[in-house]
Amino acid sequence: MSKSNKKSKPKYTLENLQQIPGVLAFMICKGNTIAHSTFLEAENPRQIAYNAMRMATRTQGTELRDLKVHTIQVQYDDFQIEMFQIGGHFCILKKRVDTD
């Protein structure tokens, strides 16, 4: 008997990051390099990438052992940062905070 492994479709892909509702800017990192960034240079994208990767490696404990995709969220007053992995790429999103 053969078992078929059903893989769930990823929530995000590299091609549709800019289409996510509320996205203000995004960055795609591959290894130690920034592959693509829409952050303004005044926002210091290198520092954003460095801080995000440091935070991601700190949280790479028990909650990431199951190999599922996890999203790390940090909320500020008027925006939030989401960090997650798509394949071998590390993605950082800056999203608008919904205030209703």
Swiss-Prot record:
Name this polypeptide is given: Uncharacterized protein F09G8.7
Taxonomic source organism: Caenorhabditis elegans
